[in-house]
Amino acid sequence: VVFLLTFVVALFSLRLLSLNQEKDERLRAVYAAESTISRVSSQLNCYLAESDFIKKYIESGHVLREEEFAAISSNMQDGSSVIKTHELAKDGVVSQVYPVAGNEAAIGLDMLHNPARKKEANLAKNSGMYTIAGPFELVQGGTGALLFDPIYTYSKKGERSFWGFSILVLQWDNFIEEVELDKMEDAGYRYQIWKKDPYTGEKIVIAESEEDFPGNALEVACSVPNDTWYFEIIPKA
C-alpha cells in the first residue's frame, strides 16, 4: 500500500511538473510572439514618422510641388533600403512618385478601385488609420507592401474631407531583415506569421522560418491597424 501510494504521488508530481513546464513554455512563446509583433509595429511607426512632415504639410492647406516632394522624399530614404518608394495619391490616384525612375508604372494607379488594393485603401480612408496592404507583387516589379496613410484637409467651417494618401512602398525582404525575425530562430523557435486575404479569406504567409513548419504550434493573434496577424510559434525539436 505504501509503495502504491508513493507511486501515485510520484506520478502526480511528475504530471504537475510537466504541466508547469508546458505553462512556462507557452508563456515564453507568447511573450516572444508579442515582442516580435511589437517590434514590427514600432518599425512601421518609424517609417510613418518620416512621412509625417509631408502629411502635415498637405493637411495645413499647402500645395506640394513636384520638386518639393522629391526633395523631402529623398531625405526619407533609409540606409537599410526598406522604403522603396514614396507616393502621393490625390483622391486615391497616384500622382507623385519618388524616385520616378523604375516606378513609372505606379503613376495613375487608382488605389480606391484597383482590384488588388481597394480593400485596404478604403479601410484606411474610412477609419483614418494607416493600413498595410500586401505583401504582393508590385506593379513596378518586385515584392513589397503598401503602407496607406490617409490625409484629410479641413474647410474654413471645420468640415473634414478626404485628400488622399501618403503611401510608403516597402521592400518586403529588406523589411523582414530590418525587424530581425531571425532572432526567433536564434532563440530556439520555429515560427510562421500570416494573415487572412481580405478578398478570399485564405491564408497569406507574411514570414516564416526556414525549417518545415508543423501543425501543432501555439497560435497568438496580434492586432495591427485594420487587420489581425497570426503568429504561430513552436520550440525547435
Which sequence ranges carry the predicted segments?
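Membrane-interface helix-start motif
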Residues: 234-237
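Intrinsically disordered, low-complexity polar/acidic regions
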Residues: 26, 30, 59-230
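Juxtamembrane extracytoplasmic/periplasmic/luminal helical "stalk" adjacent to the first N-terminal
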Residues: 5-64
